[in-house]
Amino acid sequence: MAYIFALIFAFVVCINTDVIQAEEIQHDTLRNMEYRLSCTPKNSECERMTDICCPGFQCLGCNPYDKNDVNKCKCQ
């Protein structure tokens, strides 16, 4: 009898673990989607200290230490 209860308990724990993992994967996917919607695409103007370029690109083309630079950077 104890063997049957142990199997049922193991089965329930396994199912709950799979559900938790599926929720984490779905949450991670939503977080990535929000990040990609908020990132600055290629060749768009960006500010080096505040904007986030989309993955694979960097905010380049300006010098924040040069007072003559108008800070027109682009995600490249």
From Swiss-Prot:
Respond yes or no to whether keyword Disulfide bond is given for this record.
yes
Q: Does the keyword Transcription regulation apply?
A: no
Q: Which residues form the signal peptide?
A: 1-22
Q: Where in the cell is it found?
A: Secreted
Where is the major localization of this protein?
Answer: secreted
Q: How is it modified after translation?
A: Contains 4 disulfide bonds.
- What does the entry list under GO cellular component? extracellular region
Offer an example of a GO molecular function term for this protein: toxin activity
Taxonomic superkingdom: Eukaryota
Report, as the record phrases it, the tissue specificity of this protein: Expressed by the venom gland.
Q: Which UniProt keywords apply?
A: Disulfide bond, Secreted, Signal, Toxin
The family classification in the record reads:
Belongs to the scoloptoxin-13 family.
**Name of the featured protein:** U-scoloptoxin(13)-Cw1a
